[in-house]
């Protein structure tokens, strides 16, 4: 059986959020955003969950303390999202056959969507799996270990895995969950979440 790691990128400052509270600790329906994002991941059946933290590391570590996650601190988080992606993939490389790359600000993902992505990855273990909703590419994506090295070589700045998808190609997986397109970048996104 293939081992699956979930890598949650939660290191950024959330500078577009424009609030007096750190974005990932802002309540979404009464629960801090990072925990709302984590809930379906915990229920989806991953072998390991890695949370990459950076900005507000102490507060993030404290809130994640009681959860079965491995915390990786990205001290280079100011250099862009790709540094968190790199830190998370490196952490997953030793213990997983594939990594599901999640954004910490996607609090509306459903457990069923994550399980469906894992099932698709079981059917196509050598392919990158990318969710699409109504023809639009979303997140999270699942990357097999055979692409880890290529992903690490291609990522820089805030480009994340887009270069890998362009270069290596991917399998389109249609889902009925609009949450794959929704992350919270601004206060306006929060107001419109309902």
Identify the residue ranges that each predicted region occupies.
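A short, conserved beta-strand element in the Rossmann-like catalytic core
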Residues: 16, 59, 107-108
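Conserved alpha/beta core of the MobA/IspD/sugar-nucleotide pyrophosphorylase nucleotidyltransferase superfamily
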Residues: 2, 153-194
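Short catalytic helix/loop segments, enriched in acidic residues and glycine
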Residues: 24-37
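Residue-level signal for inorganic ion chemistry
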Residues: 8, 34, 49, 88, ...
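Short glycine-enriched, charge-decorated loop/helix-capping segments at active-site entrances
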Residues: 21-27, 77-78
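Conserved N-terminal catalytic core of the sugar/cofactor nucleotidyltransferase
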Residues: 35-98, 154
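Conserved beta-loop-beta/alpha segment of the NTase-like Rossmann-fold superfamily
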Residues: 78-145
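N-terminal nucleotide-binding beta1-loop-alpha1 segment
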Residues: 1-19
């Amino acid at each position: 059986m293939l081992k699956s790691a979930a890598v949650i990128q939660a290191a950024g400052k959330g500078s577009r959020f424009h609030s007096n509270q750190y974005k990932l600790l802002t309540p979404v329906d009464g629960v801090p955003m990072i925990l709302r994002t984590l809930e379906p991941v915990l229920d989806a059946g991953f072998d390991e969950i890695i949370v990459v933290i950076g900005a507000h590391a102490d507060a993030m570590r404290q809130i994640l303390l009681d959860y079965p996650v491995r915390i990786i601190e990205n001290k280079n988080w100011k250099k862009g999202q790709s540094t968190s992606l790199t830190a998370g993939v490196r952490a997953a490389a030793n213990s997983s056959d594939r990594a599901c790359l999640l954004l910490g600000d996607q609090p509306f993902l459903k457990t069923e969507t994550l399980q469906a992505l894992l099932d698709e990855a079981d059917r196509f273990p050598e392919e990158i799996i990318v969710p699409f909703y109504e023809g639009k590419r979303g997140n999270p994506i699942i990357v097999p270990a055979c692409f880890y090295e290529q992903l690490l070589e291609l990522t820089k700045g805030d480009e994340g895995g887009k270069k890998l998808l362009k270069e290596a190609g991917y399998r389109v997986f249609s889902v009925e969950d609009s949450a794959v397109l929704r992350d919270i970048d601004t206060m306006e996104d929060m107001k419109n979440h309902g």
